[in-house]
């Protein structure tokens, strides 16, 4: 049950009437730029989390000696 080409043209015509042609062009270019930026961000390799995972955990401990009491 997909949309037929006639139905898509009607929806496009209504969108042009509501928003106007210029606004639809700018909206389309903005959406395209956002998708492009998202794809580029997904291709970049994460650097910080890998560095943190490679370092072993450090546990700091302070040792104290307890004195014996005679009682």
Curated annotation (Swiss-Prot):
It is a single-pass membrane protein. GO terms for biological process: protein transport by the Tat complex. One of its GO terms (molecular function) is protein transmembrane transporter activity. It is found in: Cell inner membrane. The chain crosses the membrane at residues 1-21. GO terms for cellular component: TAT protein transport complex. Keywords: Cell inner membrane, Cell membrane, Membrane, Protein transport, Translocation, Transmembrane, Transmembrane helix, Transport. Signal peptide: none annotated. InterPro entries: TatA/B/E, TatA/E. It comes from the Bacteria. PANTHER family: SEC-INDEPENDENT PROTEIN TRANSLOCASE PROTEIN TATA. Belongs to the TatA/E family. NCBIfam families: tatAE. The Tat system comprises two distinct complexes: a TatABC complex, containing multiple copies of TatA, TatB and TatC subunits, and a separate TatA complex, containing only TatA subunits. Substrates initially bind to the TatABC complex, which probably triggers association of the separate TatA complex to form the active translocon. Part of the twin-arginine translocation (Tat) system that transports large folded proteins containing a characteristic twin-arginine motif in their signal peptide across membranes. TatA could form the protein-conducting channel of the Tat system. This is Sec-independent protein translocase protein TatA. The lineage of its organism: Bacteria, Pseudomonadati, Pseudomonadota, Gammaproteobacteria, Cardiobacteriales. The gene is tatA.
């Amino acid at each position: 049950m997909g949309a037929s080409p006639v139905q898509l043209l009607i929806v496009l015509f209504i969108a042009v009437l509501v928003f106007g042609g210029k606004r639809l062009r700018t909206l389309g270019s903005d959406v395209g730029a956002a998708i492009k930026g998202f794809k580029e961000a997904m291709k970049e390799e994460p650097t910080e989390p890998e560095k943190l995972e490679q370092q072993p955990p450090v546990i700091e401990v302070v040792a104290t000696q307890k004195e014996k009491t005679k009682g």
